[in-house]
């Protein structure tokens, strides 16, 4: 015989798991919410690997970055409002323009989007 407390505990655990699951949203890759998540990961990556970014910048002096990104890197407060309004194509260019995009940034961005319940779809 199964005890009622076991059933109640199981139901509570299932309910907690359902409640903890984030709602999902499918957005265009150029949606500003997607861009903000991408830029948040990018800024965090720059902070964690600053020397590597400096070396990349020295080797590619014509690669420019929006001033908002530099400000966000060195402002350790809430920087998300600084990053709004950067055009999607510029976000894509700076993020995919580094050699470690595929190995480090893309997986981190995918993880951050998934954690926020955001999935991207190419518009038809």
From Swiss-Prot:
Pfam families named among the record's database cross-references: SRP1_TIP1 (PF00660)
- Cysteine disulfide partners in this protein: none
Residues of the signal peptide: 1-20
- Asked if the record carries the keyword Ion transport, the reply is no
**MF GO annotations:** structural constituent of cell wall
Q: Check the record and name the PROSITE patterns matching this protein.
A: SRP1_TIP1
Question: Which UniProt keywords are listed?
Answer: Signal
Q: Looking at the keywords, is Signal present?
A: yes
Q: Which family does it belong to?
A: Belongs to the SRP1/TIP1 family. Seripauperin subfamily.
What protein is this chain from?
Answer: Seripauperin-19
Species name for this entry? Saccharomyces cerevisiae (strain ATCC 204508 / S288c) (Baker's yeast)
């Amino acid at each position: 015989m199964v005890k009622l407390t076991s059933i109640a505990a199981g139901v509570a655990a299932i309910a907690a798991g359902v409640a903890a699951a984030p709602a999902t949203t499918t957005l265009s890759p150029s949606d500003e919410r997607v861009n903000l998540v991408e830029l948040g990961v990018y800024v965090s990556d720059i902070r964690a690997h600053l020397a590597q970014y400096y070396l990349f910048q020295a080797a590619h002096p014509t690669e420019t970055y929006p001033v908002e990104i530099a400000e966000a890197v060195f402002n350790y407060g809430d920087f998300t409002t600084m990053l709004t309004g950067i055009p999607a194509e510029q976000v894509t260019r700076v993020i995919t323009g580094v050699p470690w995009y595929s190995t480090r940034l893309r997986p981190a961005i995918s993880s951050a989007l998934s954690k926020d319940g955001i999935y991207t779809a190419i518009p038809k």
